[in-house]
């Protein structure tokens, strides 16, 4: 049975991770695993791998990189975060704290935005309340499948 609740971006959400296909997926080239929805894992993990190699290394052992979390959007009761559907990740959160601006070097921001766009993601650093650690799927299931094929991404493990 499909969950009837949805996260902010319209993807199915549930407290039961198995119900929406949330699992731990390895980020290629790192020791990190992210908990995210299987349907979007190639995009989120592919992005995280390129982020690690091109923007900054993902911290190993600092526990500041994550995906799935069943919760509301901060300060917006009743609106489920995209973390609740396994379609959002936070990377290096101890370096890029919620509300802080300019946590990335100016030269990194254009590449960061281009990478996010390449993978069909929105970057929280562009929001009115900046969340520079945050990246979320901004396209629907059909476009996700199409983009995974176009980018030649393998099914995440």
Please report, for each region that a protein language model flagged, where it lies by residue:
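Active-site acidic/histidine clusters and adjacent loop/turn architecture
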Residues: 1-58
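Active-site-adjacent loop/helix surface patches within enzyme catalytic domains
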Residues: 42-87
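Generic preference for well-ordered secondary structure
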Residues: 27-31, 75, 96
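Catalytic cores and adjacent binding grooves of peptidoglycan-active enzymes
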Residues: 76, 80-89, 93-157
């Amino acid at each position: 049975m499909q969950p009837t609740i949805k996260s902010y971006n319209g993807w199915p959400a549930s407290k039961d991770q198995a119900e929406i296909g949330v699992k731990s997926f390895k980020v290629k080239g790192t020791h990190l695993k992210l908990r995210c929805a299987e349907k979007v894992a190639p995009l989120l993990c592919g992005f995280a791998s390129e982020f690690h190699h091109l923007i900054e290394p993902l911290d190993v052992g600092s526990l500041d990189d994550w995906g799935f979390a069943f919760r509301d959007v901060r300060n917006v009761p009743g609106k489920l975060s995209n973390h609740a559907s396994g379609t959002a990740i936070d990377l290096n959160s101890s370096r890029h704290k919620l509300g802080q601006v300019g946590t990335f070097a100016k030269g990194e921001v254009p590449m960061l935005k281009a990478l996010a766009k390449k993978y069909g993601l929105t970057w929280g650093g562009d929001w009115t309340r900046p969340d520079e650690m945050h990246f979320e799927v901004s396209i629907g299931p059909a476009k996700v499948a199409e983009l995974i094929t176009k980018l030649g991404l393998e099914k995440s493990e």
